[in-house]
């Protein structure tokens, strides 16, 4: 008992012609395969064939070709409904009532069709089909809208008789249990796309499906299939509309009329095709994230890869009067290294917002006459002072670069493969074997900046921190009379004498709960850990400056207990305001009772700021002397320890391995840095490489260990990138020549 669904396909530039009744009868027998409909139903009823439909079978299908504007191809829209009990085909775009035609005279009907055709030139029509097994057929109407008008403005009629809904309310229970697929709306590149989902039992809302075929990336010869199912308020299917094939020319981006719209069956309000889909449920409000500029100021994630080594070559000396020249294949060049260098001119990680991938060059391949390949180009990642380098995989701190000019080797390049000249021996004077270059290490790296400032200015929002920085340095931060004016840390250099300077950082304001993520201060609290001295600015115009001072101190302690142990200076600001002057004595007495001597200033009038600068510099000199003594005691720091660890792993012996057995698949995995590196550098295009690999497995004890663990014939053995099938026949696993070869063929040269 599925009522008809309204389908609108707009064609702006070409007239639309209705098929006559006789033409429709003729087209039923030659129904196009592209126009076949597929109801989105788990167990659809049997569909009538085209021949049975033409002979007066139970089902009826109409299809209409709508030419798109500026497109040589066309759109085929198919309406499919379930078979009816009436054997007469009911495919018609004209109004029917109780299953009968309005006019008994066929000539009158043809005249009416001609009138409709003339009246709808340049417009689009949509058809409504009668209900399945409906005793009265329902009231079905025809509506249209002008193609030159926007769809939501030109719609003339979409009314379906309320009898359809009333009839569906009386449907039997067994038919209510009929499960069909439902559709939802998903945003696309241009427009929206309809996709099918299984319905929920409690979901009784009607679905409105709006499909816009204008998508980026589709060429003229590509196709898109869209299917829509309308549901009644009780959940059973009304009708199915399918856009089987769509071909269009997307050169004209202004063609907004080529659309297929499926409307509510019982909603008289216009459906806005171009507006967002509105389902009466309230959308969840997402918190606004940190802006990209702030997020990338002191954190970044980059990808670094060292260069692969060049391949060795197989070559022989061919020279006049030298009949037995011997092997002359050269070794491949070493891959480029990845360095991390501190650039004193940088003060943020914003350059890494667009530059993410850093790849060193690959070593050149070897050549004849024992010519080794050239080394790959190195790549240098420049970072500001105070950058911490961590591994993104394990969150392990790798490096901490503090001073400008520091340079650390992060990833060493891969070793070049050996040519056949390196495999020459007394028993093998003309080797036909060479190695591939070693792959360079790669990793994702997290960069975190902790500004290297001598003095850090902290405090509540709108306390006058930026104003103080402007008064004591040449920095020009944004200053305004509202909280959170400072969104990013600002740096300024304070000069006392010709050779006495200090760097001062103005940090964003702190709120109560900043250590848990409230406000903006928690994003930049890490920068205060680098500061030798903290200047705590208190807003004297506040109602409770004592409470503000204690709250900020508590937030610093909760974020990092080491911040409380740092020397700090308390500055009472805005003494130019009367209310601040009135509260100064009370604030001073409270802090003096705790052993703290505060300073009162007016940063706006630059009164009292010199005393603050001298006090901070005095504390800074003591801290610099302490750090210098510690550095002389501990000695210079090794910045290449990450590369040294990679080199040690490369020198791992081949006899250090582990074997893991997967009983479900009878797979034996041999894991070891040395044996896996051997497999990766083996060039399998040479027959001698396989013999060398078989001997290596025997020499390092892999075969012996597998036999002890109970490997059986037919099991799979995986060593690095090589996968083999184990066999007990010695003739298939190794040859006599391999057994007689020397162990020198599997040894590695020292890493250089």
UniProtKB/Swiss-Prot annotation:
* Family annotation (SUPFAM superfamilies): Obg GTP-binding protein C-terminal domain (SSF102741), Obg GTP-binding protein N-terminal domain (SSF82051), P-loop containing nucleoside triphosphate hydrolases (SSF52540)
Q: Where is the composition biased (Acidic residues)?
A: 103-117
Q: Kindly list the positions annotated as binding Mg(2+).
A: 466, 486
Q: Where are the transmembrane segments?
A: none
Point out the transit peptide region.
1-90
Any signal peptide, and if so, which residues?
none
Where does the UniProt annotation locate this protein?
Plastid, Chloroplast
UniProt cross-references to Pfam families, sorted A to Z: DUF1967, GTP1_OBG, MMR_HSR1
Q: Where does GTP bind?
A: 459-466, 484-488, 506-509, 573-576, 602-604
Q: Which InterPro entries match?
A: G_OBG, GTP-bd, GTP-bd_Obg/CgtA, GTP-bd_prot_GTP1/OBG_C_sf, GTP1-OBG_CS, GTP1_OBG_dom, GTP1_OBG_dom_sf, OBG_GTPase
Report which superkingdom the organism of origin falls in: Eukaryota
UniProt main location, coarse: plastid
What's the stated role of this polypeptide? Probable GTP-binding protein that plays a crucial role in chloroplast development and is required for leaf greening during plant growth.
- Hey, which family's this protein in? Belongs to the TRAFAC class OBG-HflX-like GTPase superfamily. OBG GTPase family.
Q: What is this protein called?
A: Probable GTP-binding protein OBGC1, chloroplastic
Species the sequence originates in: Oryza sativa subsp. japonica
Q: What is the lineage of its organism?
A: Eukaryota, Viridiplantae, Streptophyta, Embryophyta, Tracheophyta
């Amino acid at each position: 008992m599925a009522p008809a669904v309204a389908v609108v396909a707009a064609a702006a530039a070409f007239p639309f012609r209705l098929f006559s009744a006789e033409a429709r009868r003729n087209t039923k027998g030659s129904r196009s395969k592209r126009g076949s409909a597929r109801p989105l139903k788990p167990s659809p009823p049997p569909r009538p064939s085209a021949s049975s439909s033409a002979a007066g079978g139970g089902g009826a299908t109409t299809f209409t070709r709508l030419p798109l504007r500026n497109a040589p191809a066309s759109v085929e829209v198919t309406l499919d409904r379930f078979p009816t009990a009436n054997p007469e085909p009911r495919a018609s775009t004209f109004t029917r009532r109780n299953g009968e035609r309005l006019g008994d005279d066929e000539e009158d009907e043809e005249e009416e069709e001609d009138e409709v055709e003339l009246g709808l030139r340049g417009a689009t029509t949509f058809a409504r089909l009668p209900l399945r097994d409906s005793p009265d057929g329902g009231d079905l109407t025809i509506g249209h809208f002008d193609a030159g008008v926007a769809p939501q403005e030109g719609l003339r009629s979409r009314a379906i008789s309320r009898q359809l809904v009333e009839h569906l309310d009386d449907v039997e229970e067994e038919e209510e249990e009929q499960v069909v697929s439902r559709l939802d709306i998903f945003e696309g590149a241009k427009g929206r796309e309809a996709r099918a989902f299984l319905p929920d039992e409690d979901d009784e809302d009607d679905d409105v499906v709006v499909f816009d075929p204008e998508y980026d990336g589709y060429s003229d010869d590509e196709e898109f299939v869209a299917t829509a199912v309308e549901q009644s308020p009780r959940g059973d299917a009304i009708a199915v509309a399918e856009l089987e094939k769509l071909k269009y020319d997307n050169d004209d981006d202004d063609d907004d009329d080529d659309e297929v719209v499926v409307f509510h069956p019982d909603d008289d309000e216009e459906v806005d095709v171009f507006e967002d889909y509105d389902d009466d449920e309230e959308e969840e409000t997402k918190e606004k994230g940190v802006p990209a500029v702030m997020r990338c100021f002191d954190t970044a994630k980059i990808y670094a890869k060292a260069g692969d080594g060049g391949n060795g070559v197989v070559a022989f000396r061919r020279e006049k009067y030298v009949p037995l020249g011997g092997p002359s294949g050269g070794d491949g060049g070493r891959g480029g290294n990845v360095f991390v260098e501190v650039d004193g001119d940088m003060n943020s990680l914003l350059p890494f917002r667009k530059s993410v991938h850093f790849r060193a060059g690959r070593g050149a391949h070897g050549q004849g006459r024992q010519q080794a390949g050239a080394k790959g180009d190195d790549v240098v990642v420049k970072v500001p002072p105070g950058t911490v380098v961590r591994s993104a995989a394990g969150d392990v701190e790798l490096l901490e670069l503090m001073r400008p000019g520091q340079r650390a080797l992060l990833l060493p390049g891969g070793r070049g493969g050996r040519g056949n000249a390196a495999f020459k021996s007394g028993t093998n004077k003309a080797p036909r074997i060479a190695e591939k270059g070693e792959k360079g290490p790669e990793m994702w790296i997290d960069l975190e900046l902790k500004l290297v400032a001598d003095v850090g200015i902290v405090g509540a929002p709108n306390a006058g921190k930026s104003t103080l920085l402007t008064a004591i340095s040449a920095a020009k931060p944004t200053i305004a009379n509202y909280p959170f004016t400072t969104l990013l840390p600002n740096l300024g250099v304070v000069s006392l004498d010709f050779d006495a300077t200090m760097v001062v950082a103005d940090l964003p304001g702190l709120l109560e709960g900043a250590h848990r993520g409230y406000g903006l201060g928690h994003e930049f609290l890490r920068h205060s850990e680098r500061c030798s001295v903290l200047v705590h600015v208190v807003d004297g115009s506040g109602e409770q400056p004592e409470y503000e001072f204690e709250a900020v101190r508590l937030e610093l302690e909760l974020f990092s207990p080491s911040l409380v142990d740092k020397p700090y200076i308390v500055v009472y600001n805005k003494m130019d305001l009367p209310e601040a002057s009135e509260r100064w004595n009370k604030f001073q007495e409270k802090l003096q009772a705790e052993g703290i001597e505060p300073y009162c200033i007016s940063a706006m009038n630059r009164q009292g700021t010199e005393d603050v600068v001298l006090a901070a510099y005095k504390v800074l000199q003591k801290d610099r002397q302490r750090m210098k003594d510690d550095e002389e005691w501990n000695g210079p720091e090794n910045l290449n320890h990450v590369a040294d660890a990679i080199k040690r792993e490369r020198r791992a012996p081949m006899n250090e391995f582990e074997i893991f057995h997967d009983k479900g698949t009878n797979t034996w995995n041999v894991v070891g840095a040395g044996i896996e590196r051997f497999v990766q550098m083996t060039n399998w295009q040479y027959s001698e490489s396989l013999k060398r690999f078989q001997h290596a497995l025997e020499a390092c004890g892999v075969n012996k260990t597998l036999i002890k663990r109970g490997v059986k014939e037919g099991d799979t053995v995986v060593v690095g990138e090589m996968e083999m099938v184990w066999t007990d026949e010695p003739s298939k696993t190794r040859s006599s020549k391999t057994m007689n070869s020397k162990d020198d063929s599997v040894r590695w040269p020292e890493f250089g």
